[in-house]
UniProtKB/Swiss-Prot annotation:
<dbReference type="InterPro" id="IPR042298">
    <property type="entry name" value="P-CP_red_C"/>
</dbReference>
<dbReference type="GO" id="GO:0051539">
    <property type="term" value="F:4 iron, 4 sulfur cluster binding"/>
</dbReference>
<dbReference type="InterPro" id="IPR050152">
    <property type="entry name" value="ChlB/BchB/BchZ"/>
</dbReference>
<dbReference type="InterPro" id="IPR016209">
    <property type="entry name" value="Protochlorophyllide_Rdtase"/>
</dbReference>
<keyword id="KW-0004">4Fe-4S</keyword>
<keyword id="KW-0149">Chlorophyll biosynthesis</keyword>
<dbReference type="Pfam" id="PF00148">
    <property type="entry name" value="Oxidored_nitro"/>
</dbReference>
<dbReference type="GO" id="GO:0036068">
    <property type="term" value="P:light-independent chlorophyll biosynthetic process"/>
</dbReference>
<keyword id="KW-0479">Metal-binding</keyword>
<dbReference type="GO" id="GO:0046872">
    <property type="term" value="F:metal ion binding"/>
</dbReference>
<dbReference type="InterPro" id="IPR000510">
    <property type="entry name" value="Nase/OxRdtase_comp1"/>
</dbReference>
<dbReference type="InterPro" id="IPR005969">
    <property type="entry name" value="Protochl_reductB"/>
</dbReference>
<feature type="binding site">
    <location>
        <position position="36"/>
    </location>
    <ligand>
        <name>[4Fe-4S] cluster</name>
    </ligand>
</feature>
<keyword id="KW-0560">Oxidoreductase</keyword>
<keyword id="KW-0408">Iron</keyword>
<keyword id="KW-0934">Plastid</keyword>
<dbReference type="GO" id="GO:0016636">
    <property type="term" value="F:oxidoreductase activity, acting on the CH-CH group of donors, iron-sulfur protein as acceptor"/>
</dbReference>
């Protein structure tokens, strides 16, 4: 457990609730004190949905602490069973209520006896995993539960569909542009002549999970959620899975070639033919997607060699790093992720595309790294957007966690060929172009009386006299912050507290030496 005013990945119960509320006709009971029950408000605010969030808080109060939780939890489960008639009720504690060390599995067993719905306890260690790991585990638990139930009831149908088909695993509520990505993936698979068997958990019914093994393969677009489910299905039913994220021209082509390889295992036997997707890749890359053309244009060449910093979840940070370095010629000075549990995979993906790698879930480390590198643009989460505003560095948001402006009403996928256009726009518009800042200052676009200091520290031990301040204001805006910082660094090294014009020139000479 960690006390912080900003966390990249939330507590474990949020991940469980995100998965439960993504399914249709599934209700979640959260055994929690007041204060932990903010999920309903958060989801209602951020997701563009008309349905109520199917989550009920079973509040731990003084009466519960005095008498125990069993009666209240069981009553809440049976009440929701009668009111909502869900297919499944998921009970989850929070990290706070886990301190009580109650036998919640016993509560679930008791409630199951008087409920028509299936009732399960989310099998998650709330002290060891974060939101994303818990979501991955909960999805796998629900899929396993219903496939084992179907096996016991002899309802499991293992015969493949007549035409090539896929399950898309890992699209769920509050995901970064997940709804748009889902539409783009459906369009991509449709273009390839592949049917969608199931999409889980978003919009799926748990009663249909027994049909998952009918698909020819599973597609897992995000590493954070869905990989455990895909591994389980591979182990139990021999279902192949593809976990290459189709983001960026290169990885989309790789993903489609992997799909072709999987489809061609069965198509000669069941359909009497083989598929060739190379003409589709060629047409989309050259004529449909604008990104490949844009990367060769003079506009994109203006970005060559510019420095960028990337930070986000493992999937998006790795993909954006490769797009910037390989497809747009932008130098990635540092790339990082807050998914510490996926560090090995992340390092393997990005090691040849950036100068340094940062694995941390501490936003202050990220802020200090950005202040040190002084990139031309940042590509990160909502927190990097805040850091960018403080440092006067533009930021494009490419990963969760995000706020309301990154749940757009318009169509904004990051995956697929349309996603390449969106990413190219985002990257190009995030950089300050040419002499834009300087021209704005010349023509009075900005108030130039005060100098913007790019620093996250709150040190106030240095003072600038009026002459040095005037000299600093004469320097063009796009290099002024750097000169100010270098001068202050020189002053501290030489124990100078008052900065004059002479100190500025001495700092310049020292730097040039």
């Amino acid at each position: 457990m960690k006390l912080a005013y900003w966390m990249y990945a939330g507590p474990a119960h949020i991940g469980t609730l995100r998965v439960a509320s993504s399914f249709k006709n599934v209700h979640a009971i959260m055994h929690a004190p007041l204060g932990d029950d903010y999920f309903n408000v958060m989801r209602s605010m951020l997701e563009r949905e008309r349905d109520f969030t199917p989550v009920t808080a079973s509040i731990v109060d003084r009466h519960v602490l005095a008498r125990g939780s069993q009666e209240k939890v069981v009553d809440n489960i049976t009440k929701k069973d009668k009111q909502e008639h869900p297919d499944l009720i998921v009970l989850t504690p929070t990290c706070t209520s886990s301190i009580l060390q109650e036998d919640l599995q016993n509560f679930v067993n008791r409630a199951s006896m008087s409920s028509d719905s299936d009732v399960i306890l989310a099998d998650v260690n709330h002290y060891r995993v974060n939101e994303l790991q818990a979501a991955d585990r909960t999805l796998e638990q629900v899929v396993r539960y219903y496939l084992e139930k179907a096996h016991r009831q002899e309802k499991l149908n293992l015969s493949l569909t007549d035409k090539p088909s896929a399950n898309i695993i890992g699209i769920f509520t509050l995901g970064f542009h997940n709804q748009h990505d889902c539409r783009e993936l459906k369009r991509l698979l449709q273009d390839l002549g592949i049917m969608i068997n199931q999409i889980i958990p978003e919009g799926g019914f748990v009663e249909n999970l027994h049909e998952l093994p009918k698909a020819w393969f599973n597609l897992v677009p995000y590493r954070e959620v869905g990989l455990m489910t895909a591994l389980y299905l591979e182990k139990e039913f021999g279902m192949p899975y593809i976990s290459t994220t189709p983001m960026g021209i290169v990885d989309i082509a790789n993903c489609i070639r992997q799909i072709q390889k999987q489809v061609n295992i069965w198509s000669p036997i069941l359909l009497g033919k083989k598929f060739d997707f190379e003409p589709y890749i060629d047409e989309q890359t050259r004529f449909i997607s604008q990104a490949a053309w844009f990367s060769r244009s003079i506009d994109c060449q203006n970005l060559t060699g510019k420095k960028a910093v990337v930070f986000g979840d493992a999937t998006h940070a790795a993909s954006i790093t490769k797009i910037l370095a390989c497809e747009m010629g932008i130098r990635v000075s540092c790339t990082g992720t807050y998914c510490k549990h996926d560090e090995e995979w992340f390092r393997e993906q990005v090691q040849n595309f950036c100068d340094e790698i940062l694995i941390t879930d501490d936003h202050t480390e990220v802020g200090d790294m950005i202040a040190r590198i002084e990139p031309s643009a940042i590509f990160g989460t909502q927190m990097e957007r805040h850091i960018g505003k403080r440092l006067d560095i533009p930021c494009g948001v490419i990963s969760s966690p995000v706020h309301i402006q990154n749940f757009p009403l318009g169509y904004r996928p990051f995956l697929g060929y349309e996603g390449t256009n969106q990413i190219a726009d985002l990257v190009y518009n995030s950089f300050t172009l040419g002499m834009e800042d300087h021209l704005l200052e010349i023509f009075g676009g900005h108030d130039t009386k005060e100098v913007i200091t790019k620093s996250l520290s709150t040190d106030t031990d240095l003072t600038w006299n009026s002459e040095s301040q005037l000299e600093l204001n004469k320097i063009p805006g796009f290099v002024r912050g750097k000169i100010k910082r270098n001068t202050e660094k020189f002053a501290r090294q030489n124990n100078i507290t008052k900065i004059t014009v002479e100190v500025m020139y001495a700092a310049k000479e020292d730097l040039s030496a």
